[in-house]
Amino acid sequence: GKEITNDKAMKTLKGPLDSKVKIGVLRYGSDKIKEFTITRGNVVQHSVTSAFMINDTTGFIKIRNFGENTYPEFLSALAMLSTKNTENLVIDLRDNTGGLLQAVALMANEFLEKDQLIVYTQGRKAKREDIRADGRGAYKKIPLVVLINEISASASEIFAGAIQDNDRGIIIGRRSYGKGLVQRQLSFTDGSLLRLTVS
């Protein structure tokens, strides 16, 4: 075959829903290309990758990133664990590189009392904006542990920081990445985007 860039390969693979694309695979040790026809579809990446009981009283939720569906997925996981009489909760943010500020704020709100600070943003020329809990969270009393590591960054650090700063739970793990930034995403007509750090 001929060599193409990753960008060209991605553009070739993407297409209308339910349309077909033919790909060839050359396996290591073989000189024959094996062809496959693939039907294009929506690829859904879940933020909540697991939710289960560790023991009779402790629930566990692993969150890979903070995206548009994180909060509804998180609420579903909490509801499922609640049916199993969860008395304690472990939230695993290890290897979570962050995501949407709105998703992390909604999630933290579930555990904090009214007016407790979740996060504030402040730029060099922008005035400080506080995001506070509204007090309507359903899990304000459940004992909470948050797991982090050196890859936990951005929104993960905001969640862990809100829990720690409000003495709401215990943070366990390694020092996090250190990227407590807020970025705005600007989309351009050619499909490219720019992530601009604003605070």
Regions of interest found by a model, annotated:
Residues 1-189:
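Cleft-lining beta-strand/loop regions that shape enzyme active-site pockets
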Residues 196-199:
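Short, intrinsically disordered, charge-balanced linker/junction segments flanking boundaries
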